[in-house]
Design a protein with these regions (language model features):
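N-terminal charged segments
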Residues: 1-67, 76, 149-150
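Conserved active-site tyrosine of GNAT-family acetyltransferases
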Residues: 79, 222, 227
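Helix-loop element at the rim of GNAT/NAT acetyltransferase active sites that forms part
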Residues: 45, 125-136
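Conserved acetyl-CoA-binding loop-helix of GNAT-fold acetyltransferases
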Residues: 60-63, 180-204, 224
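A short, well-structured alpha-helix characteristic of acyl/acetyltransferase catalytic modules
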Residues: 116-128
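A conserved beta-strand-loop-helix scaffold within acyl/acetyltransferase catalytic domains
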Residues: 135-185
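A structural microfeature
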Residues: 88, 164-166, 231
């Protein structure tokens, strides 16, 4: 496995931190980063982490007390004594550079988002995909159009007959592409749309490896695209007092 001399989980940690920084910048939420961790300086929307470890040796003090959930990328911590509980654990997946075999279903229109209206459409279908098809959200609540100012962020829509049914994001760093937010609405699943969106979000034209943290339901999809597990993360949330 070639990771250009880097720990593959370090590539994952850097990608997720940069993706968070991009969205929080668009949302107007301050953040900071040093060698140990990326941290939000004000509470972000619940879909975002408030702290992300950047190396396995990160001290607990670098993340405890952050204004939201903590992403422990190497599963280095036991934060229970500090009043946290495990919310979820996910594997880190890595795929070497190169195109993925296969083609998008002919009825699927893949759109790379480039306008404010398309960002709003992306946000709407993301909510309908991750929650339910009746879910609604005020524009810009999670994904404001200001993110278009970041050329490293690639956002994709999948449309059928002009209506968005899926979405995905690819975030390019110097060493990898992080794939985030792959979803399709319930009525459009098991038709190859998520696979096509993932292929696009991998940005294979960059010649960079791709990384992501799959849900349990999505593992087999990504394995078929050539991803393999290289580590695991733990998401910690503060317990009620």
């Amino acid at each position: 496995m070639s990771t250009r001399g880097n720990d593959p989980v370090a590539l994952c940690a850097d990608a997720v931190a940069r993706w968070h920084a991009s969205w929080l910048t668009a949302l107007g939420i301050p953040w900071t980063r040093d060698a140990d961790a990326w941290r939000a300086l004000a509470p972000p929307h619940v879909i975002y982490f408030a702290a992300i470890t950047l190396r396995p040796e990160t001290p607990v003090e670098a993340v405890v007390g952050s204004p939201g959930s903590i992403c422990d990328n190497w599963q280095s911590f036991d934060l229970a004594p500090a009043g946290y509980a495990i919310f979820r654990q996910e594997p880190w997946f890595y795929r070497p550079p190169g195109p993925a075999p296969g083609a998008a279903p002919p009825e699927l229109e893949l759109v790379r988002v480039s306008t404010e209206d398309e960002v709003e459409e992306f946000e709407e279908v993301s909510v309908r995909g991750f929650e339910n098809e009746d879910a609604v959200i005020e524009a810009g609540t999670m994904h404001p159009a200001g993110v278009l100012d970041d050329p490293a962020m690639a956002i994709f829509l999948g449309r059928i007959d002009g209506k968005a049914v899926g979405a995905a994001m690819g975030y390019r760093t110097e060493a990898a592409v992080g794939v985030f937010g792959v979803t399709t609405v319930a009525s459009a699943r098991r038709r190859g749309y998520a696979t096509a969106l993932t292929r696009a979000a991998m940005l294979p034209e960059t010649g960079l490896p791709a990384v992501l943290a799959p849900s349990e339901e999505g593992k087999s999809l990504y394995e078929k695209l050539g991803f393999e597990a290289v580590g695991a993360l733990t998401i910690w949330t503060k317990t009620s007092t």
